[in-house]
UniProtKB/Swiss-Prot annotation:
Keywords: Activator, Early protein, G1/S host cell cycle checkpoint dysregulation by virus, Host nucleus, Host-virus interaction, Inhibition of host innate immune response by virus, Inhibition of host interferon signaling pathway by virus, Inhibition of host STAT1 by virus, Interferon antiviral system evasion, Metal-binding, Modulation of host cell cycle by virus, Modulation of host E3 ubiquitin ligases by virus, Modulation of host ubiquitin pathway by virus, Oncogene, Transcription, Transcription regulation, Viral immunoevasion, Zinc, Zinc-finger
Short motif Nuclear localization signal, span: 252-257
Organism: Human adenovirus E serotype 4
Residue window of motif PXDLS motif, CTBP-binding: 246-250
Region annotation Interaction with RB1 in competition with E2F1: where it falls in the sequence: 43-51
Top-rank taxon: Viruses
Sequence motif: PXLXP motif, interaction with host ZMYND11, positions: 104-108
Function summary: Plays a role in viral genome replication by driving entry of quiescent cells into the cell cycle. Stimulation of progression from G1 to S phase allows the virus to efficiently use the cellular DNA replicating machinery to achieve viral genome replication. E1A protein has both transforming and trans-activating activities. Induces the disassembly of the E2F1 transcription factor from RB1 by direct competition for the same binding site on RB1, with subsequent transcriptional activation of E2F1-regulated S-phase genes and of the E2 region of the adenoviral genome.
Protein name per the record: Early E1A protein
Keyword Metal-binding attached: yes
Length: 257
């Protein structure tokens, strides 16, 4: 056993199991056993941040650290981590390196937390006003270049027609308004003439009257009697033109009777 190896070099007479147990207990739990290691104490806020360095008195870094971790905050942290539970004695925390200091009385004050630093100027992509101005200029340019005019002669002096001609390259193209004004007699021609109105244009009545007989050279259809056998066809559409017999699509020849 491991514990028996630590015993002194002497003759051991094993009489019973109780003597072996007593020897093991004396070897492991005796007065000469080493003390267990104690953990390190929790470092205080002063030990972490209050570093003694040789710096000039007007060093801005030291002033910033002192303003952030004031003596009141350090003393309050030491008081919270102190093992003493007496509140009266914890108000005075003696230290060998800083002397005896008392936590000063704290009072509220109004602080301005606004940032007055000048940031970098915004870029062109982030300038919202510039984006709005560019969009308004683009809309204004489109509205000025594309407009529905109503010139006396359709297609001449019309800004909308010029816009389409520049974009398409066709010099004869017209806008929708000029096209409807130029060809309104085709778009809005009446379907039939009214009985009580006189036609304004020299044209025949619509629809025309049917009174003439057809000429003699017109080819007339001749009726043909269908035979019992189905005639040869070129496509399936010819088979669907008539007949009561079912459609036979098989390729074998039918026997002749």
């Amino acid at each position: 056993m491991r514990h028996l190896r630590d015993l002194p070099d002497e003759e051991i007479i094993i009489a019973s199991g109780s003597e072996i147990l007593e020897l093991v207990v004396n070897a492991t739990m005796g007065d000469d056993h080493p003390e267990p290691p104690t953990p390190f104490g929790t470092p205080s806020l002063h030990d972490l941040y209050d570093l003694e360095v040789d710096v000039p008195e007007d060093d801005p870094n030291e002033k910033a650290v002192n303003d952030l971790f004031s003596d009141a905050a350090l003393l309050a942290a030491e008081e919270a981590s102190s093992p003493s539970s007496d509140s009266d004695s914890s108000l005075h925390t003696p230290r060998h390196d800083r002397g005896e200091k008392e936590i000063p009385g704290l009072k509220w004050e109004k602080m301005d937390l606004r940032c007055y630093e000048e940031c970098l100027p915004p870029s062109d992509d982030e300038d919202e006003q510039a984006i709005q101005n560019a969009a308004s200029h683009g809309v204004q340019a489109v509205s000025e270049s594309f407009a529905l005019d109503c010139p006396p002669l359709p297609g001449h002096g019309c800004k909308s027609c010029e816009f389409h001609r520049i974009n398409t390259g066709d010099k004869a193209v017209l806008c929708a308004l000029c096209y409807m004004r130029a060809y309104n007699h085709c778009v809005y021609s009446p379907v039939s003439d009214a009985d009580d109105e006189t036609p304004t244009t020299e044209s025949t009545l619509s629809p025309p009257e049917i009174g003439t007989s057809p000429s003699d050279n017109i080819v007339r259809p001749v009726p043909v009697r269908a035979t019992g056998r189905r005639a040869a066809v070129e496509c399936l559409d010819d088979l669907l033109q008539g007949g009561d017999e079912p459609l036979d699509l098989c390729t074998r020849k039918r026997p002749r009777h």
